[in-house]
Amino acid sequence: MSRAGLDKKPDQVAAMFDQVARRYDVTNAVLSAGLDRTWRTATARALALAPGLRVLDVAAGTATSSRAFAAAGADVVACDFSLGMLAQARRRLADAAARAGAGAGTGGAGTGGGRVLLAAGDGLRLPFADGSFDRVTISFGLRNVAEGDVCLAELLRVTRPGGVLAVCEFSRPVWRPVRTAYMEYLMRALPAVARAVSSSPDSYVYLAESIRAWPGQAALAETIRAAGWTRVGWRNLSGGIVAVHRAVRPGGDD
């Protein structure tokens, strides 16, 4: 199995996620000790969802977060450049629709609230018109693109004035003893656990390396601000292991 390097070549990153797609959700739940659900909930709250809002979920993976957004009544486009992830998302949407007694349409499915549509796309060149969405979000994906500033500018472009951005990403624990223990976990325990539960454990070596190289909360906030977003702030989760950054596209009343 191959893994991506920290130069984050798009074809390598996409291939890596294709490899892990089948067991991606299970592996993440194990590696995060179940905290991934809490992080998804916090991201949904940051978006301030409401019925009828148009939401773009970039790096949506298996559309786990997208389905939660749709359950709040939003109409969601789940966008990813890994075709393996989108295939897994399609299966999960079809299963959810079958359980709900509703048929899944081509590329999308009802979720008991809004609707989820799947789209293949690169975060550096989003295939959507300017101002198409009320809310845009990327969870654990910004770290995997070669040019995060370009991705943030693209997210700004497709958001309407006054629309909201939420970025959920691994960050820096705020308490030094936790930070030390966490970095030790990343480099020693995480690869070992991944070997036991993942279909591509080498991919999680990349995960650990990319988290260690990722900037802290304040630096990411400045990058978001430099891309043109306003009212940038963040909320630490799990002591800063993860942070949700929230920002607004200027020009609206929100």
From Swiss-Prot:
It catalyses: a 2-demethylmenaquinol + S-adenosyl-L-methionine = a menaquinol + S-adenosyl-L-homocysteine + H(+). It is an enzyme of class 2 (transferase). One of its GO terms (biological process) is methylation. Pathway: Quinol/quinone metabolism; menaquinone biosynthesis; menaquinol from 1,4-dihydroxy-2-naphthoate: step 2/2. CDD domains: AdoMet_MTases. InterPro entries: SAM-dependent_MTases_sf (IPR029063), UbiE/COQ5_MeTrFase (IPR004033), UbiE/COQ5_MeTrFase_CS (IPR023576). Its EC number is 2.1.1.163. GO terms for molecular function: demethylmenaquinone methyltransferase activity. It comes from the Bacteria. Keywords: Menaquinone biosynthesis, Methyltransferase, S-adenosyl-L-methionine, Transferase. PROSITE patterns: SAM_MT_UBIE, UBIE_1, UBIE_2. Pfam families: Ubie_methyltran. SUPFAM superfamilies: S-adenosyl-L-methionine-dependent methyltransferases. Belongs to the class I-like SAM-binding methyltransferase superfamily. MenG/UbiE family. Methyltransferase required for the conversion of demethylmenaquinol (DMKH2) to menaquinol (MKH2). This is Demethylmenaquinone methyltransferase.
